[in-house]
Amino acid sequence: MSWVQATLLARGLCRAWGGTCGAALTGTSISQVPRRLPRGLHCSAAAHSSEQSLVPSPPEPRQRPTKALVPFEDLFGQAPGGERDKASFLQTVQKFAEHSVRKRGHIDFIYLALRKMREYGVERDLAVYNQLLNIFPKEVFRPRNIIQRIFVHYPRQQECGIAVLEQMENHGVMPNKETEFLLIQIFGRKSYPMLKLVRLKLWFPRFMNVNPFPVPRDLPQDPVELAMFGLRHMEPDLSARVTIYQVPLPKDSTGAADPPQPHIVGIQSPDQQAALARHNPARPVFVEGPFSLWLRNKCVYYHILRADLLPPEEREVEETPEEWNLYYPMQLDLEYVRSGWDNYEFDINEVEEGPVFAMCMAGAHDQATMAKWIQGLQETNPTLAQIPVVFRLAGSTRELQTSSAGLEEPPLPEDHQEEDDNLQRQQQGQS
């Protein structure tokens, strides 16, 4: 017998003797102990099952009972009378504070409250944002040592605080001293929400009045007044005149069979009126639109009455006298020595367009409504009756050329509006 076989035989006998001694110590009968034969050289490893292995299997982890989430949606739906205003929103925040004394689930509640603020109309109220920040537990998320200051301490809570400040930034809400005190009390001075607050206080005063054409925060709800404001906002000439060609009728005065009467509001300056009077009647004018104009969170649409650009040989160049020219009051012909590398031209991409004679905003964008606008323009522009008018509306599939005498035509069907928009844009791009 070789020394390898002797070693394996001794190892098998030791295992069998260990199992017998263990059974005797635990009180198990020897007959119940499985017999372990010595393993030889040619013995297969499949004979030893996993149940007879000496290595114990790891215990299975306990399954914790799943806790039901707090129905925060129900808190927002418990307002008396179903009213959605600032009082009901603050009452919901107070109910959450009373419901959860330990502030469990406050992160999910704050995210849900940020999404619900637009429905309650409090997205621009600073006091409501301060109440949401007041939900955070105090003196808990502040870093205590240098290690916590280096790394992001409680990152999920800090991201939630930054989300509140970002929504304030998107709606133009300037934080005050109370907001700063709450953030210091919750996250400390050396935190990312506090850094976001410092940036808001730095850049908000600089960009608050940067727009040279400011739009008021509260826009008029009446469509006629909103159209008048939008036209005044686009027209640079202060002497332009706004005309209301048609006022929408109330729903009570119109019957079920009567067609709706949309509003039509137009604007035209004296210079545009004079340019239209000098226009060649042989060349048509175009009604194009609708084009979008955003006034804060409201989008209005307008149409323009324009003409094509005249060819260079037909243009009349108006020479400005030297004493009237504010940019170059004197003409100096000085011959300075210039090298061949000097560039006399500036790289400015200027696109020349045709003149715009008038603009309007209407409640409908069909041809019949635009025809009524053209008829209203004929009262102050008599030459428009002899000029052909071509309608290039986004909702039409073809250009309809009509004379000013027979402008009243039935509106076009509104089927396949998206396909018509694409086709009309392609036609305008080719023209």
UniProtKB/Swiss-Prot annotation:
Adapter protein that plays a role in different signaling pathways including TLRs and IL-1 pathways or innate antiviral induction signaling. Plays a role in the activation of NF-kappa-B by forming a signal complex with TRAF6 and TAK1/MAP3K7 to activate TAK1/MAP3K7 leading to activation of IKKs. Once ubiquitinated, interacts with the dissociated RELA and NFKB1 proteins and translocates to the nucleus where it induces NF-kappa-B-dependent gene expression. It comes from the Eukaryota. PANTHER family: ECSIT EVOLUTIONARILY CONSERVED SIGNALING INTERMEDIATE IN TOLL PATHWAYS, EVOLUTIONARILY CONSERVED SIGNALING INTERMEDIATE IN TOLL PATHWAY, MITOCHONDRIAL. One of its GO terms (molecular function) is molecular adaptor activity. Keywords: Cytoplasm, Immunity, Innate immunity, Isopeptide bond, Mitochondrion, Nucleus, Transit peptide, Ubl conjugation. Residues 400-431 are annotated as: Disordered. Interacts with MAP3K1, SMAD4 and TRAF6. Interacts with SMAD1 only after BMP4-treatment. Part of the mitochondrial complex I assembly/MCIA complex that comprises at least the core subunits TMEM126B, NDUFAF1, ECSIT and ACAD9 and complement subunits such as COA1 and TMEM186. Interacts with NDUFAF1. Interacts with ACAD9. Interacts with TRIM59. Interacts with TMEM70 and TMEM242. Interacts (when ubiquitinated) with NF-kappa-B subunits RELA and NFKB1. Interacts with RIGI, IFIT1 and MAVS; these interactions promote RLR-mediated type I IFN induction. InterPro entries: ECIST_C, ECSIT, ECSIT_N. It comes from Homo sapiens (Human). The keyword Nucleotide-binding does not apply. GO terms for cellular component: cytoplasm; cytosol; mitochondrial inner membrane; mitochondrion; nucleoplasm; nucleus. Its main location: cytoplasm. Ubiquitinated on Lys-372; leading to translocation in the nucleus together with RELA and NFKB1 and expression of NF-kappa-B-dependent genes. Pfam families: ECSIT_C (PF14784), ECSIT_N (PF06239). This is Evolutionarily conserved signaling intermediate in Toll pathway, mitochondrial. Belongs to the ECSIT family. There is a cross-link at residue 372 (Glycyl lysine isopeptide (Lys-Gly) (interchain with G-Cter in ubiquitin)). Residues 1-48 form a transit peptide. It is found in: Cytoplasm; Nucleus; Mitochondrion. The lineage of its organism: Eukaryota, Metazoa, Chordata, Craniata, Vertebrata. GO terms for biological process: cell surface receptor protein serine/threonine kinase signaling pathway; innate immune response; mitochondrial respiratory chain complex I assembly; regulation of oxidoreductase activity; regulation of protein complex stability; toll-like receptor 4 signaling pathway.
